[in-house]
UniProtKB/Swiss-Prot annotation:
<protein>
    <recommendedName>
        <fullName>Uncharacterized protein MJ1082</fullName>
    </recommendedName>
</protein>
<dbReference type="InterPro" id="IPR051797">
    <property type="entry name" value="TrmB-like"/>
</dbReference>
<dbReference type="InterPro" id="IPR002831">
    <property type="entry name" value="Tscrpt_reg_TrmB_N"/>
</dbReference>
<dbReference type="InterPro" id="IPR011991">
    <property type="entry name" value="ArsR-like_HTH"/>
</dbReference>
<dbReference type="Pfam" id="PF01978">
    <property type="entry name" value="TrmB"/>
</dbReference>
<dbReference type="InterPro" id="IPR036388">
    <property type="entry name" value="WH-like_DNA-bd_sf"/>
</dbReference>
<dbReference type="InterPro" id="IPR036390">
    <property type="entry name" value="WH_DNA-bd_sf"/>
</dbReference>
<comment type="similarity">
    <text>To M.jannaschii MJ1503.</text>
</comment>
Length: 120
């Protein structure tokens, strides 16, 4: 069993970790990597690059901002303003995932201790 799990973990990609640990959907991962590879962009620019509609990209960006994977800044235009989005680097994503895994590990250890002490 242990060997099976270790072999599966060796095949994990950063996308798998983002899906599993951060709970991201495919479109959110796609938007993140689009920003990482192509640089910053507005909702409409990103939507065009990932071939999805504006509202889908807006939802993905909101989710990515909530996870700390995307930042935005407000740009004033002749008529109104727009937001420009930028992906944080992969080192920061790794830090976020590591922090979440550490928290999860500590919680599982507490739960197992509780389970052992209270199973009778």
């Amino acid at each position: 069993m242990k060997e099976f799990i270790i072999n599966r973990l060796k095949k994990f990609t950063i996308e798998d970790l983002m899906r599993c640990i951060l709970g991201l959907q495919e479109i959110e991962i796609r938007v993140y990597f689009d920003l990482l590879e192509n640089g910053e962009g507005s909702v409409l620019e990103i939507a065009e690059r990932v071939n999805r509609d504006r509202t889908t990209v807006q939802k993905a960006l909101r989710s990515l901002m909530n996870c700390g994977l995307v930042d935005r800044r407000k740009v004033t235009e002749k008529v109104g303003y727009k937001y420009i989005y930028n992906a944080v680097d992969l080192d920061r994503v790794s830090d976020i995932i590591e922090e979440l895994l550490d928290d999860w590990y500590q919680n599982v250890k507490k739960w197992l201790t509780y389970f052992r002490e209270n199973r009778k």
